[in-house]
Amino acid sequence: MALASSPAQRVIWQDIINFVERHPSNGSHCMKIRKLSLIAIAFLLLPSWVRASLDVELQGLEGEAQQNVATYLAAIAPEERDGSYRFKARVERDVRQALQAVGYYQPKITLNAPEGDTLVVSVNPGPPVNVAQVDVVFSGEAAMDDDFHSLKAKGPQPGHRLNHSDYESLKSQIQSLAVKKGYFDGRFTQARLEVAPDRQQAFIRLHFASGKRYHFGAIDYQGSQIQHKRLDTLRDFSPGDLYQVTDLGEFNQALANTGWFASALVQADMEDAEDNEVPIKVTLTPEARNKFETGVGYSTDIGPRLKLNWRKPWYNSRGHSLSTSLAVSQPEQTLTSTYKVPLDDVSREYYQVQLGLKNTDQRDTTSFEATTSVSRHWLYDTGWQRSVSLRWLYENYSQGQDEDIVSVVLPGVNVTRTRVRGGLMPHWGDKQSLTLEAADPAWLSDISLLRLQGRSAWIRSLNKNHRGLLRVDGGALISEEFREAPPSLRFFAGGDNSIRGYGYETVSPVDDSGQLSGARYMLTGTLEYQYRLGGNWWWAVFADGGDAWTNHLSWKRAAGTGIRWSSPVGPIRLDVAHGFDNDDDDFRVHLTLGPEL
């Protein structure tokens, strides 16, 4: 027996030896036995932290076999890796079981004497066991269900090397599919994996008797403050339809998305199922009648901003809702109230009435706006949203040398789609938006105009550490009465979400007095690359460009670098940018909070 070699072990063994030397046996046979017993007991009582812990080195394996064996051996606790016979037997047993799991039933395993702190295990896996027969049979109504036969086609096939996990996976998938599709009485009449190692053959036998498929029964709403007929439009199934668990999940999500409920739970009531029909229980908890939110924000465009929101998620039993928001900063103050009226298809179609007030005092713009709009919205399964609107705008303004009071009625149409994957800091996403509005004295407007504005933005990633952003914004105001058009309909560029390196809405034509006048046209673009520094922190480098012009396009260029933090409330962006078009251009700092699309 080799003595332990660690410093702690040597100290303990030296204490034992000293004790024995101080108590000589004087030749007594009994005393010799006592000494040997003492040594053995002391070794057994040694704490685990002083015993040697051996590493295991595998030789002769590769691929899936090597990975599976390594996984088995990694489960052996360090205190058990003591080089004992029991440890070696455990290693051999685990290697054999791990190889059997991936189809090797006749391995040759050699455990070499430990070299230092390493036990070398040499393995010849031997010939693999291949699947000779796959006997998968479905009876009952599942026999005519293509989804079950698709599972069989994707499972183990004759000629493939046996893998126990493939067999278990197929068995589990059949059971899971049966539950998802309502074969609640289904069971295996045969479920065996037979292996003949000497012949290197395996036989898979799975016979599943599904019985009859269940149908949806009655829908029982509990705790709802909203009319049941409104909730019915949120589900894509009816009593009597074939049961499908995904229908319940989609219904649950649709209920949650309405904002009417603090919690929603849709589940099959199996205890009351009869005659192959399962009732559906919908348990709902109403959302609070009034919700208040306050917040403080900051951006370099408008400085500090105070926000207050008041929402009534459900105003009445028909599911109408009301929201009012107030935002106050030094250059801008806005008050907006929105009333939403869901239609028969409550999750996809609704009317919206909006009232708004806005006061602006920013550089060469002084404006007071009052707006009223009515809009009709459609949401499609493709992700696109469409709306038509009628908006009345009253604006008392001073823009450079232009001063006026204007009233315009703007019928319009908008199409938009936003797609994201990956939460608040998406690794993939895009946004497309296009808005067209028109005004004419024929429908009580002071001026005639056509206004078009659009955005296209894209986020794409290469693995987890590289991220790119491309964004293009454009607009046009077509009118022979441009100088009568209010500032809110003209175009400006520059700022945190436009051309960084330039001040907020400072890119614009100027009038004879040198003051900003706003533009007929606007086109800006951003190209940005981001690299993950670690965790939720990113480094960014970007180039921005564009212009807002009336007669002559003068492309503005800027570039810079910055830091991104994916915070719990959304991306926070800190950038330093520099313009390249004027001798007096300087570095500008931009700080923003919010989504990039």
Give the positions of each predicted feature:
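Extracytoplasmic gating/loop element in the C-terminal half of outer-membrane beta-barrel translocons
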Residues: 278, 464-542, 548-550
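Cleavable N-terminal signal peptides
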Residues: 39-40, 50
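Gram-negative/organellar outer-membrane beta-barrel architecture
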Residues: 146, 244-433, 450, 460, ...
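Periplasmic polypeptide-binding modules associated with outer-membrane biogenesis and secretion
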Residues: 52-64, 71-300, 309, 323-341, ...
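N-terminal amphipathic/basic-hydrophobic helices that include classical n-h-c signal peptides
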Residues: 1-30
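Short glycine-rich, acidic/polar surface loops and turns
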Residues: 525-528, 556-564
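Bacterial N-terminal signal peptides that target proteins for export
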Residues: 30-38
